[in-house]
Amino acid sequence: MLPTENRLRRREDFATAVRRGRRVGRSTLVVHLRSGATDPHAPGESAPRTRAGFVVSKAVGVAVVRNKVKRRLRHLMRDRIDLLPPGSLVVVRALPGAGDADHAQLARDLDAALARLLGGGAR
């Protein structure tokens, strides 16, 4: 599970990542990344933590399917959060196909999107 201190929870933070960050889409998800954003909510920290949030709409499926997708995405981000620059804000938005995708497909799409956002991947 993704640690609590690495979770994106505030509406303003989601809006910042989506509106001011870069975006890469894949078949099952879209990833928004705002690199090196400072956290105004933690003024005492010297190195701001990278935080991730997830958006899974009703278009993905019923509640059980949406929650399954969210759990899978949180688990996948836990292993990848250290690859991102400190202070980054990441929003992973699941597309309707994510409900039918298996864990491996979500992992491939997330890896491809992050690689592209970090400048190491081709289209």
Swiss-Prot record:
Enzyme Commission identifier(s): 3.1.26.5
Pfam families referenced in this protein's UniProt entry, alphabetically: Ribonuclease_P
Highest taxon of the lineage: Bacteria
Cross-referenced PROSITE patterns: RIBONUCLEASE_P
SUPFAM superfamilies: Ribosomal protein S5 domain 2-like
Reaction equation(s) it catalyzes: Endonucleolytic cleavage of RNA, removing 5'-extranucleotides from tRNA precursor
Keywords: Endonuclease, Hydrolase, Nuclease, RNA-binding, tRNA processing
GO cellular component terms attached to this protein's record: ribonuclease P complex
Family affiliation: Belongs to the RnpA family.
Protein name: Ribonuclease P protein component
Source species of the chain: Streptomyces coelicolor (strain ATCC BAA-471 / A3(2) / M145)
Gene (name only): rnpA
